[in-house]
Structures are given as C-alpha cells and as structure tokens.
C-alpha cells in the first residue's frame, strides 16, 4: 500500500524498536505513541526493515481480530522474516531458537510456503490456481513470536505491525510431497509441550 513520508516521530519510533531488538533490552511500553492507521504502522515497519542488518527473505501473515478487521478494513497483517531467523529442519531433528528475555514470547503452529519465484504486484486479485503456481514447497512449521515489548499483543495490530509483526523467526519442516494434488486444508501443523497439544493450524 502507498506509504506516507516518515515523520520525525515515526522515525524515532522505528529507531527505538530496532534498537531494543538489537540490544535485546526490554521495552515496558510502545515508544512515544501508537500509530493510528495501517499506512503509518507499515511506514514504521518499512523504516525498521531498512535499519535491520539482515536480508529480508519472507513474510509472516496473521489474522486481525474481528474488531480490528472492522476498524481498519483489512483481514490480515504481515511482518518480515529475515534470513538469519529462517530455518528448515528434518523430521526428528530439533533446533534452539532465541526469544527476548523479559519481553513477549510464544510459539505458533504455521503452514510455511516457500515461493519458487517472486509474485508480481498487480491491480487485481490472483486466483488460487495462479498463486499456487508460484509456490515451490509447502511444509508444516512454527513461528517464534517474540518482541522486547511484553505488551505488544495487548496493544493490538498497530503495535504488532510496527514491531516486525511480532516475529522473531520461522521454522519450516520437511517439504510435503505432492501438495499441489491435495485438497485445501489437508495439512495441519500442531505445537505440543510435554506431549500436550497447545496450538494447531
């Protein structure tokens, strides 16, 4: 979406959010003032992506709450995934992922799509078949949601979008064979803790 020129205040918000992540220092609250629009929040996010010393390789996508969908006229939000925090694991293996001490941390079940080519932006919606043609692999996975700001989710979508979508990493499992011939919804990702399922998608 078109983004406004970044104000001095929003530039300061971006610097503070990025600085907290780089230093792993907790933030007690959102810095300065919450954005009031999607355009403002994504402008802050874009500035932070430019500041971040890593390569952008993908996006996490999350659903907005029903109230926020109505308020902002959008269904989903996105946040960046960077190369150093994207990992693939083989079946039966494990990986240790860092989170922000004294901040927010969660593990969320995800379905991970790895694209074989970039999807060109257009002025129309792509069909499901067209979108599927861009996908190289599909796998069950997990998102490490973490931020130096413990209250990031409590403050809502404007806070989450501004701070990298509350993303700190993505783990992709083995690629699912023959995924393109399966019916929608054939794959379920689950998160278990001590053999108890705590989340699924």
Predicted feature locations:
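Catalytic-core "active-site belt" of small-molecule-metabolizing enzymes
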Residues: 2-201
